[in-house]
Amino acid sequence: EQAAKIAKDLSVYNITWIKEPTRNNISEIEAIRKISCLPIALGENIIEKKDFEAICQKKLTDYLQLDLPRCAGITGFCEIANIALKNKIPLCSHLLYEISIGLTAAFPHGHMVEYDNLLPPGIFVETHSVRDGYLLPPQRPGNGATLTEQALKKYQTDSFF
């Protein structure tokens, strides 16, 4: 109820979407979908592929946002992106833009990449530039996240545990 009321109140501001209006509860998402007058974006907090399938098949979102670590990495991202493509739902990525920009751009329904630079500057060989509000993907092979020699030395550890 609260999310639906907020969506109605926000509708006068011409916002792009309401993001994650509820946690990963399919029945709550269905209820909000029925009464929301705003587009919905969700997915960044979803882990299970079956939940993504249900959301896409039932058209419970206008934009599917994938969080690379939560959706089983690159393989999971690609599998779920194909589910969204099959259901004609635009694909967006959540965080880790350094890697997810190339993944999102690889799909015809790739729509938007969340740009939130949480890492120290100069950590990657690739530079990511923004032009006219658009984040441009690197123009070289790879996933777009090659660590610099300085970063490798600075953040090196002797063991994983």
Regions found by a protein language model. Name each.
Residues K5, C92-F161:
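Flexible C-terminal active-site loop/helix
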